[in-house]
């Protein structure tokens, strides 16, 4: 082989190796960003929620805007719907629905915490339609006794800064997918289920002080600790998180 042929061959080989490495790296990046890599139950999130993995965490990114109508949308918005629920004491809160960017990092392999930390005010998890869950207290850290009258026909309402959320059963979801189905996850990585299990309504007496229990579900046939929505205080979550909570930024 001549010197010229050797040089050409060497350059060609280097280019081929470089292209292969670039293709592999590109493929790795693409694979890491696909929803198919997250645990199966997370793939039940709607298209409004972006899914990715960051180390040992599932990352959920959402705007908090519901995929159903509400009197809290502007009256000129196609998503506006006057209140048509069953609460005769309904009184619209002074707020509306604006997009609020949430980035939640949730443990992919949740485990029971040594000590159950209290849930904070504000977002404590995310429903399947990208609307955040809040705990059983209002913005002044008081019971929801009065604020319940401001919940729309799907049981949501906005904060004074226009961040829509659920404190109680998200009726649009339970009516659409069923009362015994997965509704979302709390920040500690444990799932939230509707108010029905085994063909009967769940009551607070069926649950522990954190508002959950261990058991099999359709998404976790081997069993997992899970929270339940009920129709009585504390509605969604009790004395704190069962596991160690991840983080939320907005």
How does the language model describe each region?
Residues 1-11:
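Bacterial N-terminal signal peptides that target proteins for export
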Residues 10-20:
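Bacterial N-terminal signal peptides
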Residues 27-145:
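Solvent-exposed N-terminal domain segments of exported/luminal and surface proteins
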Residues 95-97, 152-162, 210-223:
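Short, low-complexity cationic-aromatic patches
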Residues 103-106, 127-132, 160-173, 220-234:
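Extracellular/lumenal glycan-associated surfaces
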Residues 144-151, 160-201:
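Short helix-loop boundary/capping segments
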Residues 207-250:
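Long, compositionally biased interface segments
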């Amino acid at each position: 082989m001549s010197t010229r042929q050797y040089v050409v061959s060497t350059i060609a080989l280097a280019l081929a190796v470089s292209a292969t490495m670039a293709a592999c790296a590109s493929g790795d990046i693409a694979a890491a960003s696909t929803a198919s890599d997250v645990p199966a139950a997370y793939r039940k999130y709607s298209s409004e929620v972006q899914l990715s993995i960051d180390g040992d965490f599932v990352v959920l990114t959402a705007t908090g805007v519901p995929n159903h109508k509400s009197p809290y949308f502007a009256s000129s918005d196609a998503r506006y719907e006057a209140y048509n629920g069953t609460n005769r004491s309904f009184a619209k809160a002074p707020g509306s629905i604006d997009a609020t960017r949430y980035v939640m990092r949730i443990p992919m392999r949740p485990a029971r915490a040594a000590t159950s930390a209290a849930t904070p005010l504000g977002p404590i998890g995310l429903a399947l339609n990208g609307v955040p869950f809040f705990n059983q207290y209002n913005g002044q850290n008081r019971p929801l006794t009065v604020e319940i009258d401001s919940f729309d026909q799907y049981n949501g309402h906005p904060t004074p800064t226009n961040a829509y959320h659920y404190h109680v059963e998200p009726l649009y979801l339970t009516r659409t997918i069923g009362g015994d189905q997965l509704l979302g996850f709390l920040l500690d990585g444990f799932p939230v289920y509707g108010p029905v299990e085994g063909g009967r309504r769940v009551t607070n007496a069926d649950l522990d002080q954190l508002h959950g229990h261990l058991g099999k579900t359709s998404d976790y046939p081997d069993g997992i600790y899970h929270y339940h929505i009920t129709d009585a205080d504390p509605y969604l979550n009790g004395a704190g998180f069962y596991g160690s909570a991840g983080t939320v930024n907005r």
